[in-house]
């Protein structure tokens, strides 16, 4: 049984850092484990221009504690009105690494998202030409589609036509949650990748309802059936370079999670690599963790691997019950429980 594992320093290819006091509270958790992260642009207002991304990047770097090294990889928020010229500027900037597609209303702060992907044709053509990846929240938002089917329907309605019309466009299917998505990404032609969260590797939808409503397990896309969790584990541990780490760590104040209309999102930045190690260990695939965490993402984005390392040790430790979060608190996933791995 492996007791210690040292891997190339990993990256997080899907992260929510928020802004202001919330940013300052959560950024150190990510920077302790990850060298770089793709930063989601769904602030209020959303980050839709290169100038806004530059300003947000500056705020992130200003919030980084002294002595910590971390590179934020910025993204733009795609709207019906994003001009192709903004894509050219994004490519030239050197710090914008993707454009995020949120179907309007799909998740937190997505109201300004795309209402019809066909309206973005000229912009998508510019992205294909400039080599700027499209990062996709892969769910339809039609009220007549069951919430557990939104991802599968998205593949047929949006992803397949998108890939047909823009076959050379780099596409990341973010935080996949279904067997359908894992199979689609594995078999798709052209430059397609996918991020997978730790919580979707570890839990199925029963976790939300065990002994009562468990709001800290509620995220979007929502946890699915066990057959889907198993398919995600198989994909993540397959060795395929198309699958890579993206925590989708999404902090919300405790009062906004434990609420009559609670927010979606699991906070895992504090203990992300410990959770991934647990999932890969349970699958008997610790030898595949480094590629998933540290190699596949940089290869897809055309970036070099990190030079540092991170060590995971089989060691019991108790996760805090809550964490400071501005003038309130934040509850990490599995708060107060014992974890079996420790990252250093």
UniProtKB/Swiss-Prot annotation:
One of its GO terms (biological process) is 'de novo' UMP biosynthetic process. GO terms for cellular component: cytosol. Zn(2+) 2 binds at residues 100, 137, 175. Its cofactor is Zn(2+). Its EC number is 3.5.2.3. It comes from the Bacteria. The active site is at residue 248. Pathway: Pyrimidine metabolism; UMP biosynthesis via de novo pathway; (S)-dihydroorotate from bicarbonate: step 3/3. It catalyses: (S)-dihydroorotate + H2O = N-carbamoyl-L-aspartate + H(+). The modification N6-carboxylysine is found at residue 100. Zn(2+) 1 binds at residues 14, 16, 100, 248. Keywords: Hydrolase, Metal-binding, Pyrimidine biosynthesis, Zinc. Substrate binds at residues 16-18, 42, 137, 220, 252, 264. Pfam families: Amidohydro_1. GO terms for molecular function: dihydroorotase activity; zinc ion binding. Homodimer. Belongs to the metallo-dependent hydrolases superfamily. DHOase family. Class II DHOase subfamily. Catalyzes the reversible cyclization of carbamoyl aspartate to dihydroorotate. This is Dihydroorotase. It comes from Cupriavidus metallidurans (strain ATCC 43123 / DSM 2839 / NBRC 102507 / CH34) (Ralstonia metallidurans).
């Amino acid at each position: 049984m492996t007791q210690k594992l040292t891997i190339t320093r990993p990256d997080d290819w899907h992260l929510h850092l928020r802004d202001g006091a919330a940013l300052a509270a959560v950024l150190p958790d990510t920077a302790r484990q990850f060298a770089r992260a793709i930063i989601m642009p769904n602030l209020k207002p959303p980050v839709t221009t290169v100038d806004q991304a530059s300003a947000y990047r500056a705020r992130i770097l200003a919030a980084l504690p002294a002595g910590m090294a971390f590179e934020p990889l910025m993204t733009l928020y795609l709207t019906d009105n994003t001009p192709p010229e903004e894509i050219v500027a994004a490519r030239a900037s050197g710090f914008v690494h993707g454009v995020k597609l949120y179907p309007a209303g799909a998740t937190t702060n997505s109201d300004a998202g795309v209402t019809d992907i066909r309206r973005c044709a000229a912009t998508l053509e510019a992205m294909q030409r400039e080599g700027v990846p499209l990062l996709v929240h892969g769910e339809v938002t039609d009220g007549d589609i069951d919430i557990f089917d939104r991802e599968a329907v998205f593949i047929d309605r949006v992803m397949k036509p998108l890939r047909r019309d823009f076959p050379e466009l780099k596409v990341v299917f973010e935080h996949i949650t279904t067997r359908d998505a894992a199979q689609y990404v594995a078999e798709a032609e052209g430059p397609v990748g996918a991020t997978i969260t730790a919580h979707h590797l570890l839990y199925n939808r029963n976790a939300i309802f065990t002994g009562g409503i468990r709001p800290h397990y509620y995220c979007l896309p929502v946890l699915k059936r066990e057959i889907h969790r198993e398919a995600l584990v198989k994909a993540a541990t397959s060795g395929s370079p198309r699958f890579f780490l993206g925590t989708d760590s999404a902090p919300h104040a405790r009062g906004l999670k434990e609420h009559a209309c609670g927010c979606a999102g699991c906070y895992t930045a504090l203990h992300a690599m410990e959770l991934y190690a647990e999932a890969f260990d349970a699958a008997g695939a610790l030898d595949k963790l480094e590629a998933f965490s540290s190699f596949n993402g940089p290869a897809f984005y055309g970036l070099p691997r990190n030079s540092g390392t991170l060590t995971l040790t089989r060691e019991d430790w108790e996760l805090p019950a809550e964490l400071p979060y501005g003038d309130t608190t934040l509850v990490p996933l599995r708060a107060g429980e014992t974890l079996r791995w420790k990252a250093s």
